[in-house]
């Protein structure tokens, strides 16, 4: 009986879901912005909506690319990173967190001018970065299987969430 209830519910919901997906307009290319000299590959992207900047983890260059979306050009490249993979702008702390796979560190930059304000050592393969705006926390996947919970005010790891494998994306 439960199986039939689930099938009935799915059949009623399915047209609404597929209709919503097909009713929206397709994406339209508005502009192309060359990233400049990036050797190797890029990884995750972050966005600073306030300043209209795209943040590009340039893993192959060991740098962070900063793109001015309003002007449609690269503003700068921040060197000295170690295989940056994850990047996120943290609006409630006006800072940028960059996770580095090469040395397992997280570099923290001031949002206004992207100058360094801190560094958090996670030990191994820091990767993806996510922002929890409800709890005012930053989450960074790292190592063989963990999420570091970071307080963006004290710039310290306050907890670990253990996982069964490396969190490539979450």
Predicted regions span which residues?
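Predominantly soluble domains enriched in secretory-pathway, periplasmic, or organellar proteins
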Residues: 12, 17-170
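Bacterial N-terminal signal peptides that target proteins for export
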Residues: 1-6, 16
């Amino acid at each position: 009986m439960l199986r039939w209830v689930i099938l009935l519910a799915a059949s009623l919901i399915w047209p609404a879901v597929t209709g919503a997906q097909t009713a929206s307009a397709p994406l339209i290319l508005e502009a192309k912005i060359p990233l400049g000299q990036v050797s190797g590959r890029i990884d995750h992207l972050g966005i600073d909506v306030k300043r209209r900047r795209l943040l590009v983890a340039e893993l192959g260059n060991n740098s962070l690319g900063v793109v001015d979306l309003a002007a449609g050009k690269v503003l700068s490249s921040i060197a000295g990173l170690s295989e940056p993979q994850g990047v996120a702008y943290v609006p409630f702390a006006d800072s940028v967190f960059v996770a580095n796979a090469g040395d397992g560190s997280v570099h923290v930059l001031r949002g206004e001018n992207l100058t360094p304000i801190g560094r958090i050592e996670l030990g191994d393969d820091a990767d993806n970065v996510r922002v929890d705006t409800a709890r005012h926390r930053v989450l960074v996947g790292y190592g063989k299987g963990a999420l570091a919970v970071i307080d963006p005010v004290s710039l310290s790891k306050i907890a670990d969430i253990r996982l069964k494998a490396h969190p490539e994306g979450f």
